[in-house]
Amino acid sequence: MQKLIEDITKEQLRTDLPAFRPGDTLRVHVKVVEGNRERIQIFEGVVIKRRGGGISETFTVRKISYGVGVERTFPVHTPKIAKIEVVRYGKVRRAKLYYLRELRGKAARIKEIRR
């Protein structure tokens, strides 16, 4: 039974996504269904956490929209994500960047690294 579950989850895993870590700025292209039509919506922000492993792995992206912080959590291997672009690689010393929720303006900047 365990082998069967592993085989099914292995074929569901996506391999077309770029490597990214907390602190990186991503542009996530999400498929949104409105009525009978489907369109792509772009959500761009900083990855503040990545958790789990395998098929249940998720990541959370935070952005500021009209002065309000918006966080959205995505499963990594969902078919709802059309593609992920890494806009900027950030250098941070934490795995979970919850402290960014309290910071405003220039204090919330993340140092950029070249890769």
UniProtKB/Swiss-Prot annotation:
Keywords linked to the UniProt accession: Ribonucleoprotein, Ribosomal protein
Cellular component annotations (GO), alphabetically ordered: cytosolic large ribosomal subunit
Source superkingdom: Bacteria
GO biological process: translation
Gene3D superfamilies (alphabetical): 2.30.30.790
Record Pfam families: Ribosomal_L19
Keyword Ribonucleoprotein: yes
Membrane spanning residue stretches: none
Keyword 4Fe-4S in record: no
GO molecular function: structural constituent of ribosome
NCBIfam families per UniProt: rplS_bact
Main function: This protein is located at the 30S-50S ribosomal subunit interface and may play a role in the structure and function of the aminoacyl-tRNA binding site.
Subunit-level organization: Part of the 50S ribosomal subunit.
Family that this chain belongs to: Belongs to the bacterial ribosomal protein bL19 family.
Protein name: Large ribosomal subunit protein bL19
Gene symbol of the encoding locus: rplS
